[in-house]
């Protein structure tokens, strides 16, 4: 930081302010986490200088013998974590991992059966504003209105009616366990391939806290951040039989040179995920989410599906007559960062919404446990009861900052 502040004080100031924001506030965005010093060091290393088009041992540039070591470590560790025969660690993001799979098994105009974005899916699962919705014919499934759980009978009925080439399972705002075996049975019945996007739950899958899609899905994609607690990036997992096709769709299909400094950081994070302490961490993430959800429910707030099985929960504020947008702003003023989110059967626009998504991975990384979740829940309830009370929100923010600074960002 010292050199950055000297050479470019404007950027240096932005970074310094962001460190202060992360340190003094509570990060409740379910897709965010804090990486280790070792991951940051790898990502900020001289590997950022190196072009390495191709794959280990088959590069289009010279001088790749050492970045090959890093990429091979990332591949081998990913395969060890998830028990699969193939891993591609080059996708720059989860979206590009999904694109690579789509290009490997679909033609423009083919049919995808994916989860409705407003029911918890993701943009890349067929949203009309995304490439997936523009290139392919998309049919959406959702959750049951009365329970908030995926309607597997609807999935099966839609699959029989539309005969999709690819079924996509996985979500960005679904708080319950996903039955991958049920999805595979439906896919087999209609002759479809199954892709699982486990970006949000990869850390839970890695530690056995959520059923694995490996062995059920033909293709599995994930991000490498979120619960996996690595650098921002993507990855594809599959069988070795699919290696040639998938590799060619990432490079040269949709990417050129891989980001070797990020791949090295992925390798470091995967090494951390193979340690027993990572199991302890994921168990605490789930415990914290359950406690936070329980406290919010006890305080009279509705949660989609009534609770959570994983690391996140979705508050439905419809009955409170608070918009997700206003709730997000109030929480931010109170020192807590969350994101507005659509809820199933949403009546408001995606820019306003009726929900707020909350998650526990980042708070758990800082060392917080169930007792701390009770305090966090109390502050959330207080803030949402005072959405328009600037004085009270500022007071909560001061309390939150004193509390947050007891849990350092860089403790591991």
UniProtKB/Swiss-Prot annotation:
The protein's superkingdom reads: Bacteria
Q: Which family does it belong to?
A: Belongs to the SHMT family.
PANTHER family attached to this UniProt entry: SERINE HYDROXYMETHYLTRANSFERASE (PTHR11680:SF50)
Cited function:
Catalyzes the reversible interconversion of serine and glycine with tetrahydrofolate (THF) serving as the one-carbon carrier. This reaction serves as the major source of one-carbon groups required for the biosynthesis of purines, thymidylate, methionine, and other important biomolecules. Also exhibits THF-independent aldolase activity toward beta-hydroxyamino acids, producing glycine and aldehydes, via a retro-aldol mechanism.
Q: Which residues does the record give as (6S)-5,6,7,8-tetrahydrofolate binding sites?
A: 117, 121-123, 349-351
A GO CC term assigned to this protein in UniProt: cytosol
| Cited InterPro entries | PyrdxlP-dep_Trfase, PyrdxlP-dep_Trfase_major, PyrdxlP-dep_Trfase_small, Ser_HO-MeTrfase, Ser_HO-MeTrfase-like, Ser_HO-MeTrfase_PLP_BS, SHMT-like_dom
Enzyme class name: transferase
Q: Which reaction does it catalyse?
A: (6R)-5,10-methylene-5,6,7,8-tetrahydrofolate + glycine + H2O = (6S)-5,6,7,8-tetrahydrofolate + L-serine
Cofactor annotation: pyridoxal 5'-phosphate
Q: Name one GO molecular function term.
A: glycine hydroxymethyltransferase activity
Task: List the protein's name.
Answer: Serine hydroxymethyltransferase
List the residues marked with site Plays an important role in substrate specificity. 225
SUPFAM superfamilies in the record, alphabetically?
PLP-dependent transferases
List the lineage, top down.
Bacteria, Pseudomonadati, Thermodesulfobacteriota, Desulfovibrionia, Desulfovibrionales
According to its UniProt entry, one GO biological process term is: glycine biosynthetic process from serine
Carries keyword Transport? no
- The source organism is Nitratidesulfovibrio vulgaris (strain DSM 19637 / Miyazaki F) (Desulfovibrio vulgaris)
């Amino acid at each position: 930081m010292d050199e950055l502040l000297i050479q470019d004080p404007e950027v240096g100031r932005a970074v310094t302010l962001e460190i202060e924001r992360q340190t003094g506030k509570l990060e409740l965005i379910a897709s965010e986490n804090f990486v280790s010093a070792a991951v940051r060091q790898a990502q900020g290393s001289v590997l950022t200088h190196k072009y390495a088009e191709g794959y280990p041992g088959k590069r289009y540039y010279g001088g790749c013998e050492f970045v090959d070591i890093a990429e091979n470590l990332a591949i081998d560790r990913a395969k060890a974590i998830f028990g699969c025969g193939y891993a591609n660690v080059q996708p720059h993001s989860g979206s590009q991992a999904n694109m690579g799979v789509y290009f490997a098994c679909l033609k423009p105009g083919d049919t995808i059966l994916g989860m409705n974005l407003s029911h918890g899916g993701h943009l890349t699962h067929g949203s009309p504003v995304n490439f997936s919705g523009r290139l392919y014919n998309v049919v959406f499934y959702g959750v049951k209105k009365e329970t908030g759980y995926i309607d597997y009978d609807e999935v099966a009925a839609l699959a029989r009616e539309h005969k999709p080439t690819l079924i996509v399972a996985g979500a960005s705002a679904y708080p319950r366990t996903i039955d991958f075996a049920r999805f595979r049975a439906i896919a087999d019945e209609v002759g479809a391939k199954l892709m699982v996007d486990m970006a949000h739950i990869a850390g839970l899958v890695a530690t056995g806290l959520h059923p694995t899609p490996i062995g059920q899905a033909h293709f599995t994609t994930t991000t490498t951040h979120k619960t996996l607690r690595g650098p921002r990036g993507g990855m594809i997992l599959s069988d070795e039989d699919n290696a040639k096709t998938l590799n060619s769709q990432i490079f040269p299909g949709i990417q050129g040179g891989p980001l070797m400094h990020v791949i090295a950081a992925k390798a470091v994070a995967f090494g951390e995920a193979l340690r027993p302490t990572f199991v302890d961490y994921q168990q605490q993430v789930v415990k914290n989410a359950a406690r936070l959800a329980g406290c919010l429910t006890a305080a009279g707030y509705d949660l989609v599906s009534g609770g959570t099985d994983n690391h996140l929960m979705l508050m439905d504020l419809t009955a409170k007559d608070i918009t997700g947008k206003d709730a997000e702003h109030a929480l931010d003023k109170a020192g807590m960062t969350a994101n507005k989110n659509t809820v199933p059967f949403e009546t408001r626009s995606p820019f306003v919404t009726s929900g707020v998504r909350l998650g526990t991975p980042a708070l758990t990384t800082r060392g917080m446990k169930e007792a701390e979740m009770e305090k966090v829940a109390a502050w959330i309830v207080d803030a949402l009861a005072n959405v328009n009370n600037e004085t009270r929100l500022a007071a909560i923010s001061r309390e939150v900052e004193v509390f947050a600074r007891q849990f350092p960002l860089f403790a591991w």
